[in-house]
Amino acid sequence: MNRRRRIYEGKAKILYEGPEPGTLIQFFKDDATAFNKKKHDVIDGKGVLNNRISEYIFTHLNKIGIPTHFIRRLNMREQLIKEVEIIPLEIVVRNVAAGSLAKRLGIEEGTVLPRSIIEFYYKADALDDPMVSEEHITAFGWASPQELDDIMALAIRINDFLSGLFLGVGIQLVDFKIECGRLYEGDMMRIILADEISPDSCRLWDVETKEKMDKDRFRRDMGGLVEAYQEVARRLGIINENEPPRGSGPVLVK
């Protein structure tokens, strides 16, 4: 059995060397973390669901001309992706007050914002991913002004698409987090969407009941995380109504 070279391991995913130059294999783990690993658990089946949901969303984004790193899903837990140079920022798009925004500004959770708000956080676990401004980003060279414009344009288009997609299946897109990277193609470089989009990185509420269908179920000790993720997948038509919960999937080849 061939051993694959591990490139990077994060909180919820592992990146391995891909089969061809310029590619990587992205493996989705069952680890659930919150508050920068201060809270941690392993929830059987979570990685499989995130892989399927993220595949579905990235495939649709590619089809409408939003560039992503996604190439194809390989199996229940793995995707083949393009290798990019990750920009060290988390880009958060907020449509409804929730989480840290509600707490920071004293806004009642669930309040619809006057317009969508884009926030930037510097990716540094040791610092608890501090919120930063565009001035910080350009001053420290994390991204150029043009790259920031490209990132914001991508974020707005993704928000428009996701809001409509989820609303069509009775889900409100409260907010979501994305990461972007630089894709080098010969002498050209462009900014594309990387990482994942799943209930791990979105706040999703049922339109009618406001029931949480995302990682807040883990953050707030509500339970039922896998069931909520399965419901998101069912509503999107990714898994059938009667499909049983998945187990751990194929054994990871290290």
Swiss-Prot record:
InterPro entries to which the protein is assigned, alphabetical: SAICAR_synt/ADE2_N (IPR028923), SAICAR_synt_PurC (IPR033934), SAICAR_synth (IPR001636), SAICAR_synthetase (IPR050089), SAICAR_synthetase_CS (IPR018236)
Keywords (A to Z) from UniProt: ATP-binding, Ligase, Nucleotide-binding, Purine biosynthesis
EC number annotated for this UniProt entry: 6.3.2.6
Pathway the protein acts in: Purine metabolism; IMP biosynthesis via de novo pathway; 5-amino-1-(5-phospho-D-ribosyl)imidazole-4-carboxamide from 5-amino-1-(5-phospho-D-ribosyl)imidazole-4-carboxylate: step 1/2
An annotated GO cellular component: cytosol
Record field: catalytic activity: 5-amino-1-(5-phospho-D-ribosyl)imidazole-4-carboxylate + L-aspartate + ATP = (2S)-2-[5-amino-1-(5-phospho-beta-D-ribosyl)imidazole-4-carboxamido]succinate + ADP + phosphate + 2 H(+)
Keyword Ribonucleoprotein found: no
Keyword hit for Zinc: no
SUPFAM superfamilies with a match to the protein in the record: SAICAR synthase-like
Single GO BP term: cobalamin biosynthetic process
Gene Ontology molecular functions: ATP binding; phosphoribosylaminoimidazolesuccinocarboxamide synthase activity
Family of the protein in this entry: Belongs to the SAICAR synthetase family.
Name assigned to this protein: Phosphoribosylaminoimidazole-succinocarboxamide synthase
